[in-house]
Curated annotation (Swiss-Prot):
The gene is bud-31. It holds the Pfam family BUD31. The keyword Disulfide bond does not apply. Belongs to the BUD31 (G10) family. GO terms for cellular component: spliceosomal complex. This is Protein BUD31 homolog. Involved in pre-mRNA splicing process. Keywords: mRNA processing, mRNA splicing, Nucleus, Spliceosome. A motif (Nuclear localization signal) lies at residues 8-12. Identified in the spliceosome C complex. It is found in: Nucleus. It comes from Caenorhabditis elegans. GO terms for biological process: mRNA splicing, via spliceosome.
Length: 147
């Protein structure tokens, strides 16, 4: 879905400062369209969605950084981005909590999706894992977001 379509769906004109973040969000939309149409021959079933998860993470991190770290956008614009689903509100809420600052996706901390009621392997600290083993999250392809 294009950026213009999402804006029409919100039925509200974007707040002041939109022109500052619009070009970057357009680039993320173009990357997302490219990742969605990318051929998936030769990939495992779980690997197909990994580029989409990465772009989604980057886009949410961009909006988060612009509001919380750099303070370059207003609260009104930040909330507009969340309601228009340009950024993932649940993921940003986790980033604000201690220990989840580098979380890759919300699926990795959702214990309902796992067989044993535990978090994803990418949430295990690297110091507690073998150095030779390559760890990849099944959900998003993360190599370890816990530190």
């Amino acid at each position: 879905m294009s950026l213009a379509t999402k804006l029409r769906r919100v039925r509200k004109s974007p707040p002041e400062g939109w022109d500052l973040i619009e070009p970057t969000l357009e680039q993320f939309e173009a990357k997302m369209r490219e990742a969605e149409t990318e051929p998936h021959e030769g990939k495992r079933k779980t690997e197909i969605n990994w580029p989409i998860f990465r772009i989604h993470h980057q886009r949410s991190r961009y909006v988060y950084d612009m509001y919380y770290k750099k303070a370059e956008i207003s609260r009104e614009l930040y909330e507009f981005c969340l309601t228009a689903k340009f950024a993932d509100a649940a993921l940003i809420a986790k980033w604000k909590k201690q220990g989840y600052e580098n979380l890759c996706c919300v699926k990795c901390v959702n214990t309902r999706d796992s067989n044993f009621g535990t978090a994803c392997i990418c949430r295990v600290p690297k110091s507690k894992l073998d150095a030779e083993r390559v760890i990849e999250c099944v959900h998003c392809g993360c190599h370890g977001c816990s530190g």
